[in-house]
C-alpha cells in the first residue's frame, strides 16, 4: 500500500498546540502500527544536553514526532488542507489532492 503522507510533503497541523502551523515532513516514523511524522518547526521541545568531549552542552530545540492523524497535506493549488487519492497516469500510480485534482509530488 502506498503512503499518503511522505517525507518532503508540505503539511498543516489540524489539532494540538501547534494547530494551523505549516511545515515540511522531515521523516516518517513507523513503530508497531503507529505512524508518526517529524515536521519542521512543529512539536518543538527543549532537550538539555550534557557537555561531552567534542561538543559543549546546553539546551537544544528538537522536533518530536506528531501522529499522522493530526496532520493533513496542503493542496498545491489552494494551499488548504486536503485528502489524498491515488490514480494511474501513463502506467504510473500518482497521488493527487482531492480538493483541486492537482498531482502531489
From Swiss-Prot:
The keyword RNA-binding applies. Coiled coil: none annotated. Keywords: Ribonucleoprotein, Ribosomal protein, RNA-binding, rRNA-binding. InterPro entries: Rib_uL2_dom2, Ribosomal_uL24, Ribosomal_uL24_CS, Ribosomal_uL24_KOW, Translation_prot_SH3-like_sf. GO terms for biological process: translation. SUPFAM superfamilies: Translation proteins SH3-like domain. Part of the 50S ribosomal subunit. This is Large ribosomal subunit protein uL24. It comes from Wolbachia sp. subsp. Brugia malayi (strain TRS). The gene is rplX.
Amino acid at each position: 500500500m502506498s503512503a499518503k503522507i511522505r517525507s518532503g510533503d508540505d503539511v498543516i497541523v489540524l489539532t494540538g498546540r501547534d494547530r494551523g502551523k505549516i511545515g515540511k515532513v522531515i521523516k516518517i516514523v513507523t513503530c508497531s502500527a503507529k505512524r508518526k511524522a517529524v515536521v519542521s518547526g512543529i512539536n518543538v521541545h527543549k532537550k538539555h544536553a550534557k557537555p561531552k568531549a567534542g561538543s559543549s552542552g546546553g539546551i537544544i530545540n528538537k522536533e518530536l514526532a506528531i501522529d499522522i492523524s493530526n496532520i493533513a497535506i496542503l493542496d498545491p493549488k489552494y494551499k488548504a488542507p486536503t485528502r489524498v487519492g491515488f490514480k494511474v497516469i501513463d502506467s504510473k500510480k500518482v497521488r493527487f489532492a482531492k480538493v483541486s485534482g492537482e498531482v502531489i509530488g
